[in-house]
Design a protein with these regions (language model features):
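Short, small/polar-rich loop/turn modules that mediate ligand/substrate recognition or access, typified
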Residues: 175, 180, 246-248
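Residue(s) in the substrate-gating loop at a strand-loop-helix junction
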Residues: 143
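Conserved glycine-rich cofactor-binding loop
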Residues: 17-18
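Active-site helix of classical SDR
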Residues: 123, 159, 167
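Short C-terminal tail/terminal secondary-structure segment
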Residues: 2, 148, 236, 247-261
Length: 261
């Protein structure tokens, strides 16, 4: 998708420093948006801003989506620099891996807090901007794990199902407010998160890195891993004027994985 389809719009992307978040922020900037890069670590955010330029982007560090006051302060700063928020991408996530019997409460709660509570807090703070304009896009980065089950990631699966539930509820609630709310559900994607999953497979099975990657790629009927840019393209489409009638949907970017299952 090309052209300045987001010109003069303000997009806020959480978890923007690396992986899918960085690809989404880059796509929004190339589409003409002013982009607030939100995250907890300054270095990757600053590096991305260096690539995209400071005129079109701002960095929101210490943006902990589970902390109500930090969310409120970060969004206030975003507004002061770039004005009301038109497009929100809730990308920040947490994906712990462990057998269910060894998953402690703290781990389970953290997955819910980052994935579900984070999307709730940030969306609640941003939505008044959209209601005032009678226009806005909320795009939640979920996962195929929000639609089907996977072993050894029960906390993540439960959390991503929650994200899709929140998406569907808000889509109905805001249907007459000019706001669309959708989820994008990537399959296994070439990101630092995937690298950690590969490391975990290697540690537990002693298999080679190539074999571990092949195992993850095999879940995709196309026989490959998804790229962050492919996920970003789906987000950009949902943020575009042409997607005004698309709301409450979970768009799968996984080469047919969920359909095949």
């Amino acid at each position: 998708m090309t052209g300045q389809i987001l010109k003069d719009r303000h997009a806020l992307v959480t978890g923007a420093g690396t992986g899918i978040g960085a690809a989404i922020a880059t796509a929004c900037a190339k589409a003409g948006a002013r982009v607030s890069l939100a995250g907890r670590r300054r270095d990757p955010l600053a590096a991305l801003q260096g690539k995209l330029g400071s005129a079109q982007t701002q960095v929101l560090t210490d943006f902990d989506v589970t902390d109500e006051e930090k969310v409120r302060a970060g969004i206030a700063l975003a507004r002061r620099e770039f004005g009301p928020i038109d497009v929100l991408v809730n990308n920040a996530g947490e994906a712990p891996s462990a057998p269910f019997a060894k998953t402690d409460l703290a781990t389970f709660n953290k997955a819910l807090a980052v994935n579900v509570i984070g999307a709730f807090l940030v969306t609640r703070e941003v939505v008044p901007d959209m209601i005032a304009k009678h226009a806005g896009r909320v795009i939640n980065i979920a996962s195929t794990a929000g639609l089907i089950g996977y072993a050894y990631v029960s906390a993540y699966v439960a959390a991503k199902h929650g994200v899709i539930g929140l998406t569907r509820a808000l889509a109905i609630e805001f249907a007459r407010s000019g706001i669309t709310v959708n989820a994008v559900c990537p399959g296994f994607t070439e990101t630092p998160l995937l690298d950690r999953a590969v490391d975990n497979i290697i540690a537990k099975t002693k298999r080679s890195r190539d074999d571990a990657r092949a195992t993850l790629a095999a879940t995709n009927p196309q026989g490959r891993l998804v790229t962050p840019e492919e996920v970003a393209d789906a987000v950009l489409w949902l943020a575009s004027p042409g997607a005004h009638s698309i709301t409450g949907q979970a768009i799968v970017v996984a080469g047919g994985e969920v359909m095949a299952g």
